[in-house]
Amino acid sequence: MAKLIVYVLRLGHREVRDKRVTTHLFLAARAFGADRVIYSGRRDEKLGESIEKIVETWGGVFEIEYQKDWRKTVKDWKSQDGEVIHLTMYGLPIQEVIAAIRQSHRDRLVVVGGAKVHGDVFELADWNVSVTSQPHSEISALCIFLHELFKGKELARTFENAEKRIVPQAKGKKVMRRKSGKFRPN
């Protein structure tokens, strides 16, 4: 079976106001198993540069893309038989729908809001999913959703072509750096 694709669509990025939140959302998406992030709102070249540096240093394949028209992105995804999952505090509880979402063999576009989310998102989504029905960040909702989707397997993922790797320690820090194709202590 081919690997399922998971993309994250960040709605309504605002360059000055959302810079840190959007960057953290993208880092979380990468760490928790998404293949790519797409964002709408204000184009921000520095976002791409920041994420590219992380991928160079810590490895893996992860892409960032800007799309001005989020509706077109969602409609194109659906027209290619992709599934759209909108994370919202108003949706169905994750614990009630995650098994059905996992059973789908369609590629997934996980939509997370920024500022006020347009009502069309709720109608276009195949799933409106809540991670608690309480206000919290889109970052925490995305992390919990991806963790549940992948059943925790994303936590043991290895990122290929990394320049650095962490060696887990009970105390202290240990980082290995790639030198001459092999990892050696820093």
Q: Where are the model-predicted features located?
A:
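RNA substrate-binding interface of SAM-dependent RNA methyltransferases
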Residues: 1-89, 147-155, 182-185
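Long, charged alpha-helical interface segments
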Residues: 170-186
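Long, charge-patterned amphipathic alpha-helical coiled-coil/hairpin "stalk" segments used as oligomerization
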Residues: 91-131
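Structured adenosyl-cofactor binding patch, chiefly the S-adenosyl-L-methionine
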Residues: 121-170
